[in-house]
């Protein structure tokens, strides 16, 4: 009787361990998807900020060019 209970207990723990592994893999897939979404949103924000001249390193500067310039330079935001 004790042996039967022990065997059933071991089998039950094995089934629970398998379901935990399956849940873990589903969670990993969800976290990977969430990571990809965050990465793409970050890329969008980065590109959006550069299109409109915002600099992440120095918020007091504007990256652009005036008509008389033949290249892009850093200007103070007061010069615009």
Swiss-Prot record:
Tissue expression summary: Hemocytes and pharyngeal tissues.
Record's keyword annotation contains Secreted: yes
Propeptide: 20-29, 54-80
One GO cellular component term noted in the UniProt record for this chain: extracellular region
One Gene Ontology term from the biological process aspect of the record: defense response to bacterium
Cell compartments where the protein resides: Secreted
Protein name: Clavanin-D
Source species: Styela clava (Sea squirt)
Lineage, opening ranks: Eukaryota, Metazoa, Chordata, Tunicata, Ascidiacea
